[in-house]
């Protein structure tokens, strides 16, 4: 019995060590906010104008602050075509939040990611400016490398964000805020920390054709000399159906190019998805970092004076215009609400969506 217990403890310890090692090579994520409107996290908040202004209180993040009882509701259409009109709501929101990070993340590349903020924002972490000090544009993900200004373990980190509802860039205002919809302010999509090994895959661009031809450009950060990228294609059951190894060119990019056999093709009615696993290795084959990305094999063609073909079959688009919006939560949605919209669109026998007039939540695109 004692030998069995000892063996079990050794086996469990080995499994734990293996799991930790696997996690250390994968990209890891820690949310500082909620994932959406259904699980917001309270941050300290101060609004400079409108309702409930002039005092520090709490606000759920992510959210549009108007829907949380702050600032001024304003519809954009009355200001259409006017760069700097009188009467525009221009309050600011100041956010503060403290958090800790795992001690084992020390030495990794640490990125602070905002999915979207309306509209201008200035970010500091532990009293130091993040990035160039100002991000503009309300619908785009932006990322700061904060590896050199972050603490680990029990030492708390302090995040401060100042958000301006109106942009100081008139072109941003004309493009985003002088239109036929509500103008909101706030950190309205999730905020999270990403941890990667110091040598890592920064991003990947995939081009997978309907004939099984798979290509990808892997952009690398601080890749060592002789680095290579191993690519594995997994089917829906997790089985490896194809693999390849590509050398990094100029040490900061690897081009993947190989053929797969008889893949199941993606269409609007049969959206077969595969998973590409990209593994960055050093010259000796040691794994440095691993990324995963879902994709579908498909070929899209436009034939002049004819139409659009997907995988050689002509497609008649039956679509709808869709805003990222709910009257209860503004532009802050959730995975459930995004899936709800997709199911509604499919129930109307539609096969296309116009994402007016800005990038949608990643969860909507993935649905």
Where are these regions (language model features)?
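Bacterial N-terminal signal peptides that target proteins for export
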Residues: 1-10
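Hydrophobic h-region of N-terminal signal peptides that target proteins for export
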Residues: 11-20
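Accessory carbohydrate-binding/adhesion or oligomerization-edge regions at the termini
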Residues: 21-78, 162-171
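Accessory beta-strand-rich segments of carbohydrate-active enzymes
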Residues: 26, 48-49, 90-201, 223, ...
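N-terminal carbohydrate-binding accessory modules
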Residues: 27-34, 204-205, 277-347, 366
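Beta-strand-rich binding/interaction modules
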Residues: 123-125, 213-248, 254-256, 276
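Short hydrophobic beta-strand segments in globular cytosolic domains
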Residues: 130-131, 241, 315
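Surface beta-strand/loop "capping" patches
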Residues: 195-224
């Amino acid at each position: 019995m004692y030998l069995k217990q000892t063996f079990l403890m050794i086996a469990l310890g080995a499994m734990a060590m293996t799991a930790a090692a696997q996690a250390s090579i994968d990209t890891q994520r820690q949310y500082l906010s909620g994932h959406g409107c259904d699980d917001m996290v309270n941050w300290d908040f101060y609004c400079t104008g409108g309702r409930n202004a002039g005092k520090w209180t709490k606000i759920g993040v992510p959210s549009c602050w108007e829907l949380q009882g702050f600032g001024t509701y304003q519809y954009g259409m009355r200001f259409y075509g006017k760069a700097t009109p009188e009467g525009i709501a221009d309050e600011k929101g100041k956010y503060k939040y403290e958090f800790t990070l795992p001690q084992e993340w020390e030495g990794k590349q640490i990125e602070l990611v905002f999915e979207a903020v309306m509209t201008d924002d200035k970010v500091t972490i532990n009293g130091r400016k993040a990035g160039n000090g100002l991000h503009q544009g309300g619908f785009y993900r932006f990322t700061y490398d904060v590896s050199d200004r972050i603490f680990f373990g029990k030492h708390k980190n302090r995040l401060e964000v100042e958000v301006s509802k109106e942009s100081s860039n008139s072109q941003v205002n004309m493009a985003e805020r002088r239109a036929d919809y509500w103008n909101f302010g706030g950190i309205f999509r999730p905020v999270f920390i990403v941890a990667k090994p110091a040598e890592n895959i920064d991003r990947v661009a995939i081009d997978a054709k309907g004939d099984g031809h798979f290509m990808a450009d892997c952009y690398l950060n601080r890749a060592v000399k002789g680095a290579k990228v191993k690519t594995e294609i997994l089917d829906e059951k997790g089985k490896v159906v194809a693999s390849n190894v590509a050398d990094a060119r100029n040490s900061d990019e690897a081009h993947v190019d190989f053929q797969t056999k008889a893949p199941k093709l993606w269409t609007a009615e049969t959206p077969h998805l595969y998973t590409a696993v990209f593994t960055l290795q050093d010259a000796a084959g040691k794994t440095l970092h691993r990324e995963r990305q879902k994709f579908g094999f498909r070929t899209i063609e436009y034939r002049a004076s004819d139409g659009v073909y997907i995988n050689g079959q002509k497609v008649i688009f039956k679509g709808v215009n869709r805003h990222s919006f709910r009257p209860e939560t503004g532009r802050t949605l959730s995975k459930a609400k995004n899936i709800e919209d997709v199911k509604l669109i499919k129930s109307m026998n539609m096969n296309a969506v116009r994402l007016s007039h800005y990038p949608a939540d990643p969860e909507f695109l993935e649905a």
